[in-house]
């Protein structure tokens, strides 16, 4: 069976990003975005998704982190879409409820090729450090470019870092379920016959 993998490059006046994904070959993640907090979240995603994942990214972070975070989401989404391919034999759906200390987050997704994002996370504004509002921008960009229906809900939580960590880990775990093979590796999981 052909390996499900992709390599996508995105180069604009604002960012330069290369993403490699291999759904069938688990490698140690290689993450370098010049944004320490984003690196940490993407490493968590990669480890918990169980996929081969590499990203090298740079951009105009002297302005702020928005362009790089959003473009990383775009590029990862495009790579996921290409790697998943025709979706024959995949489970298609995934969901995970993940605790992280005082935080509890739930992620559910569908790889049907239709974009939708529901994002409910009560993350408090923080004057210094990472702009946590960019997490929603990241997942919007990723889901819209991958064609994923994605529901993210923080059920409870107090610490911004823990909330973000639980969301990225839960997303990785839900994606792991969705891209795994079902017992019938030859059919597309839809009554339409295609996704």
UniProtKB/Swiss-Prot annotation:
Pfam families: IGPD (PF00475)
Keywords: Amino-acid biosynthesis, Cytoplasm, Histidine biosynthesis, Lyase
Enzyme class: lyase
Catalysed reaction equations from the record: D-erythro-1-(imidazol-4-yl)glycerol 3-phosphate = 3-(imidazol-4-yl)-2-oxopropyl phosphate + H2O
The enzyme's E.C. designation: 4.2.1.19
Pathway: Amino-acid biosynthesis; L-histidine biosynthesis; L-histidine from 5-phospho-alpha-D-ribose 1-diphosphate: step 6/9
Key word Lyase present: yes
An MF annotation (GO) of this entry: imidazoleglycerol-phosphate dehydratase activity
Record's subcellular location: Cytoplasm
Gene3D superfamilies (alphabetical): Imidazole glycerol phosphate dehydratase, domain 1 (3.30.230.40)
Gene Ontology biological process terms in this record: L-histidine biosynthetic process
GO CC annotation: cytoplasm
Family: Belongs to the imidazoleglycerol-phosphate dehydratase family.
Cross-referenced HAMAP family: HisB
Name of the protein: Imidazoleglycerol-phosphate dehydratase
Protein source organism: Endomicrobium trichonymphae
Gene: hisB
């Amino acid at each position: 069976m052909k390996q499900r993998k992709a390599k996508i490059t995105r180069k604009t006046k604002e960012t330069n990003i290369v993403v490699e994904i291999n759904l069938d070959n688990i490698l140690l993640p290689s993450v370098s975005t010049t944004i320490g907090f984003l690196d940490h979240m993407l490493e968590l995603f990669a480890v918990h998704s169980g996929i081969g994942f590499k990203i090298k990214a740079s951009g105009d972070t002297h302005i702020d982190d928005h362009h790089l975070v959003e473009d990383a989401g775009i590029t990862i989404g495009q790579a996921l879409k290409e790697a998943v391919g025709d979706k024959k034999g995949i489970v298609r759906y995934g969901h995970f409820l993940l605790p992280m200390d005082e935080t509890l987050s739930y992620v559910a997704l569908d790889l049907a090729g239709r974009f939708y994002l529901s994002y409910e996370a009560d993350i408090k504004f923080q004057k210094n450090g990472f702009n946590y509002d960019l997490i929603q921008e990241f997942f919007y960009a990723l889901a819209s470019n991958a064609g994923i229906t994605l529901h993210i809900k923080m059920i409870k939580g107090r610490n911004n870092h823990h909330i973000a960590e639980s969301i990225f880990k839960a997303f990785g775990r839900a994606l792991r379920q969705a891209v795994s093979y079902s017992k019938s590796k030859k059919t597309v999981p839809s009554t339409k016959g295609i996704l």
